[in-house]
Swiss-Prot record:
Glycan attachment residues as annotated in the record: N60, N129, N186, N209, N230
Organism annotation: Arabidopsis thaliana (Mouse-ear cress)
Cytoplasmic-side segments: 314-675
Alphabetical list of Pfam families matching this protein: Lectin_legB, Pkinase
Similarity-based family: In the C-terminal section; belongs to the protein kinase superfamily. Ser/Thr protein kinase family. In the N-terminal section; belongs to the leguminous lectin family.
Span of the signal peptide: 1-22
Entry protein name: Putative L-type lectin-domain containing receptor kinase I.11
EC number: 2.7.11.1
């Protein structure tokens, strides 16, 4: 009886031991590469093991493929196990085909069957088809690594990880990333990079966790996805197959599994040995033979590009083209490049235009290391002789006087000259005399300006190496600096004379109202400048233009009108009403009378500029004369011939004028409308 009982106990013990051993065999497995694993795996479709490395390839970058690799034996979970549990760790790689977008991805699969003959590739990942997707009879759980955004499955992007239950519409998904334990935040990871990626899938206590990381990173502390799932509801018979599925469509890639570890228990899961994992092949782009047509098209494209670039070069060359001759080398320090002036004036922008006169337009600009400038574009008459023209421009730039607008240099291109001068911040005098939007100048300011211009003219006539005739003195050519000092500018018709030279003049130049009567017969001289300065004195004191056709005829000619006022013993009536009576009567009357002396139609009766300075500074008394004196108050040359041979004893006697034919220098700085 005792022996029978002992025999029964031993039988039960050996049966239980056999059961435990079989359970341990089914508890898990590990593949560090798949070189010896073919007998334990079920492969179908495009799936195969690449020898000798033992790399498991699911697809080979061909279109419309699917491949499956499952552990052959199902794992049975007995009914006494209240909850299913498992853990797996695998390393995969999705390698793009050179020159193609990859697709569609890899899925780790838990299924009640390994028969996927009815499944479709492409977005169905070789797991389902349009009929079975979402069907209650589909006993399937998949962790998808999806590299294509499928709108029909509401994919979030083309680089995401998702949990799929009976359908490719993920119940949980997130863009591929991993939690960095070092940085304490998620870091993105690209699935279709060709690099090995680690995936952990842990299911325990009805909680499914999916964790992702690059090969070089240990398992992160936090999973990417976490979802409560009851697998018993999905797999009521509790018999489960574990494996992988991958698919391509028109989008293709190489999809590999490098190593795989599986266990029923997370605590018993074996670690993969990365040193034993196979290498990932990276295909090189095929060097396709270039067709002759493509070569011709490329050559044609190159020729077109060269033509376009050549056109741009020629356009820019023409745009910035300048005329340079050998003789100009000696003047190079005074020459500016057209490109620098083009940029300085913001391409001669109209908003920067300061004025427009008879000789050209003036623009404001700014040059580095120079500052604010005024640039006048002058159309040059080639008949005048360019070499002499440039020489006189440069010589004009050498004139140094505090009451001259400094000429900084020039630029020459084709029939155009650009003259560069210092910018005068307060513009021209005529704006303050005739434009009501400008404030009226006080008498003291006007007198200072007249003295400044007289000083500048005296310098031009006697202070330079050569006599310089300005030939266009008027209010619009008198510039005002920041302190309202007068500066004589616009040498648009200026010319040089050697002392004692005498050459006939062939044409009269100047501005109507400022031109001396003898210009038509005797040409220019220093006395023609004195005449114009006399008109300027009347203009500044009266606040009127020398000729104004809009007013009654008896007041139309400024010189005659001032003389008429004097003749009526009311010369103060000619004074600018904008002064509001705030002026010295003695000074204003002196300036008006001096203006009449300077505008005497008998040139020899006009004072020199040196004498004008003495008079205007009241260092000398004015000559004794009256409105009826010969040549006084005559604004037209009608009486010129009858009085020219006479001599006025009431005005200083001046030596005979000389007139010369010289290059006229077109240097104009006009800030108002030229007249």
């Amino acid at each position: 009886m005792a022996s029978e009982r002992l025999h029964l106990i031993l039988l039960v013990f050996f049966n239980h031991l056999t059961f435990l051993l079989s359970q341990q065999e089914e508890a898990g497995f590990i593949y560090n590469g798949f070189g010896q694993a073919q007998a334990g795996l079920h492969l179908d479709g495009a799936a195969k093991i690449l020898f000798p490395d033992g790399l498991l390839q699911l697809t080979n970058a061909s279109t419309q493929q699917m491949g499956h690799a499952f552990f052959k034996k199902p794992f049975k979970f007995d009914s006494y196990e209240k909850k299913l549990s498992f853990s797996t760790h695998f390393v995969c790689a999705l390698v793009p085909k050179p020159g193609a977008d990859g697709g569609h991805g890899i899925a780790f699969v838990v299924s009640s069957s390994i028969d996927f003959t009815q499944a479709d590739p492409t977005q169905y990942l070789g797991l389902l088809n349009i009929s079975t997707n979402g069907s209650p009879s589909s006993q399937l759980l998949a962790i998808e690594l999806d590299t294509v955004e499928s709108a029909e499955f509401d994919d979030i992007d083309k680089n995401h990880v998702g949990i799929d239950i009976k359908s490719l519409n993920s119940v949980e998904s997130a863009s591929a990333s991993y939690f960095s334990n070092a940085k304490g935040k998620n870091q993105s990871i690209k699935l279709l990079s060709g690099d090995p990626i680690q995936i952990w899938v842990d299911y325990e206590g009805a909680l499914l966790n999916v964790t992702v990381a690059p090969l070089s990173i240990q398992k992160p502390n936090h999973p990417l996805l976490s979802r409560s799932i009851n697998l018993t509801d999905i797999f009521p018979d509790r018999k489960l197959f574990f494996g992988f599925s991958a698919a391509t469509g028109t989008l293709v890639s190489y999809q590999y599994i490098l190593g795989w570890s599986f266990s029923r228990s997370r605590m018993l899961l074996q670690s993969l040995d990365f040193s034993k994992l196979p290498q990932i092949p990276h295909p090189k782009a095929k060097q396709e033979q270039t067709s002759p047509l493509l070569i011709v098209l490329l050559m044609l494209l190159v020729l077109i590009m060269l033509a376009v670039l050549g056109g741009i070069y020629l356009y820019r060359r023409k745009k910035y083209a300048e005329v340079r001759e050998v003789w100009e080398k000696e003047y190079s320090p005074h020459r500016f490049s057209y490109k620098s002036l083009y940029k300085a004036t913001n391409r001669f922008d109209k908003d920067g235009r300061l004025g427009k006169g008879g000789f050209g337009e003036v623009y404001r600009g700014n040059l580095p290391h120079v500052g604010d400038i005024a640039v006048k574009r002058v159309c040059h008459d080639a008949k005048q002789g360019m070499k002499q023209f440039v020489a006189e421009v440069v010589t004009m730039g050498s004139l140094k006087h505090r009451n001259l607008v400094p000429l900084l240099g020039y630029c020459r291109r084709k029939g155009e000259l650009l003259l560069v001068s210092e910018y005068m911040s307060n513009g021209s005098l005529d704006q303050y005399l005739f434009h009501r939007e400008k404030p009226a100048l006080s008498w003291s300011q006007r007198l200072v300006i007249l003295k400044d211009i007289a000083s500048a003219l005296s310098y031009l006539h006697t202070g330079a190496n050569q006599v310089v005739l300005h030939r266009d003195i008027k209010a619009s050519n008198v510039m005002l600096d920041s302190e309202f000092n007068g500066r004589l500018g616009d040498f648009g018709m200026a010319r040089f004379e050697d002392y004692g030279d005498s050459v006939p003049v062939t044409a009269a130049v100047g501005t109507m109202g400022y031109m001396a009567p003898e210009l038509t017969t005797m040409g220019t001289s220093t006395r023609t400048d004195v005449y114009a300065f006399g008109v300027l004195m009347l203009e500044v004191t009266c606040g009127r233009r020398p000729l104004d056709p809009k007013i009654p005829s008896e007041k139309r000619h400024l010189i005659k009108w001032v003389c008429d006022c004097w003749r009526r013993d009311s010369i103060v009536d000619a004074i600018d009403t904008r002064l509001g009576g705030q002026y010295s009567v003695e000074e204003t009357v002196m300036v008006l009378k001096l203006g009449l002396i300077c505008t005497n139609i008998v040139a020899e009766s006009r004072p020199t500029m040196e004498q004008v300075i003495q008079y205007i500074n009241q260092n000398l008394p004015l000559p004794n004369f009256s409105p009826g004196s010969l040549g006084i108050g005559v604004s037209t040359p009608v009486l010129l011939e009858s009085v020219f041979n006479s001599r006025s004893s009431l005005a200083p006697s001046i030596s005979p004028p000389s007139s010369h034919n010289s290059m006229f220098v077109t240097h104009t700085i006009t800030y108002g409308d030229g007249r």
